[in-house]
Structures are given as structure tokens and as C-alpha cells.
């Protein structure tokens, strides 16, 4: 049995969900509500010690890290392939998969600053401390504490956007001749970068709009049936976030 523990339209969750839909691989969806911190409950941490989504569980064996999960899916379910056959094209696909993974911390910072911080600042101090105490990854713990406290400085956000803008520029250049980053074949590189580019467009539209080649690629990507399925909100796999502040459940 293939089970995917995910949180709907979070960046890394979308990458793996889209891949599975593109390939037509059936899976059992296990939604993890991050806003009620289900990812920090003992049962989830036993599967994923980092306390992040997604986690793929195949016949009882957990696979973590979205990049590793996507490679695993291609290894176990090779058809239809989302990895180019040509070695040079495959290296290009892997490069952009790695870039999407490497730039994620910068994307997380601007997302927290624009979307999450307002909510986190309303959480009482005792709950903030309890949540932070359960977060195993130091960088993520620091990001959460900053978003619930003094927030991110203008320099922090400017630096994150500078990194993101650099990546968007490089990716736009790599899309020629197109239509996809590895040419005619749609690949994991496109899937991984779509989650990054789409989030940048949502938070700062001009970063994509001023790059016509990138904007055209994004429009083509969003027209794919698997993307429309994966990126839709208000669905069983991507329900709307709960309103208000949900208390952290007591540890078992």
C-alpha cells in the first residue's frame, strides 16, 4: 500500500502529489493539518523525525524529504517516466530538482513573513514555547519563533527575495527552447520548480510577470490536468485551513 502524508497545497506536498497524479499512481491520502500541528504529534514524528510534510509510506516503510520521495517514486513506478532518458537532459532535470530543494528556505521565509506571521503572532506565549519545544529541526524552530515574535527584518526578506529572483532568472533562461525545462519531455524538474515559481507569483507577481518566457511556462504548467487537480483548494486533499488558533494537543 502507498500512503502519502501531506498538507495539501504546501510547496513540497504539491510536488509529490502532482507527480503521483501525472503518473497515475494510486495512493491513500493522509492529510496532516499543520495549523493544528499534527506534524508534531508523536505518531507522525515516529515516521518523520523532522516533523515536516510530506512523508511517503510504502508497505509500512516511511520515505522522507520530497526530493528523495520523488526519486523513489520514479524508481518504483518507472512508467510513465518523468526522468529524461538522455543523460544530459536527465542531469538538467536533476539540477532543477536540487535547486528547488535548495531555495526552499528562502521561499519559506517570505511565505512566513507574508502569510503565517500574522497568525502566529496571535498565539499565546505559553503555546508558542510548547510548539517550539516539539520542533526537532533548529532552523524551522527559529523561523517559527521569529514569525511568532519580532518577525523578519526588512534585510532578511530582501535577501530572500534576491536569492529567489536569481533562481527565477536562471530558470527562465533554462526554459529555451522549451516548452519544458528539458525540452519536449515534461519532467520532475518542471514539477519541482512549479511549486517554487507558483508561490513566488502568488506573493510577488512581478517576479514572474516581467519574464515572458517564465510566465508562458507557468501558464502551460497550470493548464495541465494534474496541476489543476493538485493545486485546487477546498478539496478533500486540500481543505481550507481552520479558522482561529488551535491549541497544541498534549503529548502522549
Residue ranges of predicted features:
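GST-like domain detector, emphasizing the conserved glutathione-binding G-site
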Residues: 1-138, 151, 248-249
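C-terminal or late-domain output modules
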Residues: 5-6, 14, 23, 176-185, ...
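Mixed-charge, polar/low-complexity N-terminal
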Residues: 19, 29-31, 35-38, 42-43, ...
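Flexible, active-site-adjacent loop/turn segments at secondary-structure boundaries
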Residues: 42-45, 80-81, 155, 178-180, ...
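N-terminal cationic-hydrophobic initiation segments that often serve targeting/anchoring roles
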Residues: 74, 97, 172-175, 222
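GST-like fold's C-terminal all-alpha helical module
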Residues: 105-219
